[in-house]
């Protein structure tokens, strides 16, 4: 089935839903395609404490649900589908989805966000889903009263470690440097938590486990200076080393930098293709916060309205 629209938004995180709210309020009747992970990365975050307007801690999934309801209430059509292919060679742009629908849009706002990075070692792939995860809120419950390793040193890693103490007996954070880059408030909480210990200047060399049944039993960690290898016993490994922007759909059709982020014009959400805009983590390699994603979604919506009114 072919569907036409003035504005099509790809992605439903803070950027996509903010873009939807603002384009809908401009009477542009936007269509938003949810994607494979409706709500984006915030649906995998428990406590949200830094989103303005909430004096008390809120839950990430709840915040995204409220944004989605608001977008619908002002006139956004939200489609539970995912995009398989796009054609940005000329307007109207063509979008093909997994359910077989074809959309033609006068403008597109790309808000496909980013996904978790992995270590890239063979044993990680072998035990993914059998003790290796990148989502504490999704899988933490399965490690009740067990020992867990968290890999990383940014906000995500520390948030995961702190959350996992609700379930685990002990959480060990393995970081390749000798200091964290996470916010100080998170570091303070982590260092005060008796369930958490930190191993500095180490990387994961191998994840070890059993095949009968298939489970993780530990990690071999390597000192980055001496190359000495030691074994840390654990039942689960949570990888929190950052994210990769979801731009594969647009390869060869739009300007993308060496880190796979969509290139937007300075101070704008305009991309290299006229009529195509990008907002949120798919184009932001510096801030990567929910509030900045939402703000860039607003910017994209205002720029789309101006573009369509030419």
UniProtKB/Swiss-Prot annotation:
SS bonds (residue pairs): 135-138
Annotated catalysed reactions: [thioredoxin]-dithiol + NADP(+) = [thioredoxin]-disulfide + NADPH + H(+)
Compartments in which it is found: Cytoplasm
Disulfide bond found in the keyword field: yes
Primary location class: cytoplasm
EC number(s) recorded for this UniProt protein: 1.8.1.9
CC terms in the record's Gene Ontology section: cytoplasm
Stored PROSITE patterns: PYRIDINE_REDOX_2
Cofactor binding description: Binds 1 FAD per subunit.
UniProt keyword terms in alphabetical order: Cytoplasm, Disulfide bond, FAD, Flavoprotein, NADP, Oxidoreductase, Redox-active center
Keyword set includes Flavoprotein: yes
Cofactor: FAD
GO molecular function: thioredoxin-disulfide reductase (NADPH) activity
Record text on subunit structure and interactions: Homodimer.
NCBIfam families linked to this entry: TRX_reduct (TIGR01292)
Similarity comment: family membership: Belongs to the class-II pyridine nucleotide-disulfide oxidoreductase family.
Protein name per the record: Thioredoxin reductase
Species annotation: Rickettsia typhi (strain ATCC VR-144 / Wilmington)
């Amino acid at each position: 089935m072919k569907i036409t629209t003035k504005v099509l938004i790809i992605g439903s995180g803070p950027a996509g839903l903010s873009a939807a709210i603002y384009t809908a309020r401009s009477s542009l009747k936007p269509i938003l395609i949810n994607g494979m992970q409706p709500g984006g990365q915030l649906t995998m975050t428990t406590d949200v404490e830094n989103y303005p307007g909430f004096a008390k801690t809120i839950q990430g999934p709840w915040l995204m649900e409220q944004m989605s309801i608001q977008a619908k209430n002002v006139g956004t059509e939200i489609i539970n589908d995912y995009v398989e292919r796009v054609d940005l060679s000329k307007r109207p742009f063509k979008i093909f989805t997994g359910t077989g629908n074809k959309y033609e849009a006068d403008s597109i706002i790309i808000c496909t966000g980013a996904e978790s990075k992995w270590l890239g070692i063979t044993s990680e792939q072998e035990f993914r889903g059998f003790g290796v995860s990148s989502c504490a809120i999704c899988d933490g419950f399965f490690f009740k009263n067990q020992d867990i390793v968290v890999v990383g040193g940014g906000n995500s890693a520390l948030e995961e470690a702190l959350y996992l103490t609700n379930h685990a007996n002990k959480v060990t954070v393995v970081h390749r440097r000798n200091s964290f880059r996470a916010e100080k408030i998170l570091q303070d909480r982590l260092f005060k938590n008796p369930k958490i210990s930190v191993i500095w200047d180490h990387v994961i060399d191998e994840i070890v486990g059993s095949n009968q049944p298939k489970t993780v039993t530990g990690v071999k960690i390597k000192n980055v200076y001496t190359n000495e290898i030691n074994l840390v016993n654990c039942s689960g490994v949570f990888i929190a080393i950052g994210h990769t922007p979801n731009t594969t759909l647009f390869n060869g059709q739009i300007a993308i930098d060496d880190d796979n982020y969509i290139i937007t014009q300075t101070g704008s959400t305009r991309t290299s293709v006229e009529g195509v805009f990008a907002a949120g983590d798919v184009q932001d390699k510096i801030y990567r916060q929910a509030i900045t994603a939402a703000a860039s979604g607003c910017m994209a919506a205002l720029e789309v309205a101006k573009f369509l009114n030419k």
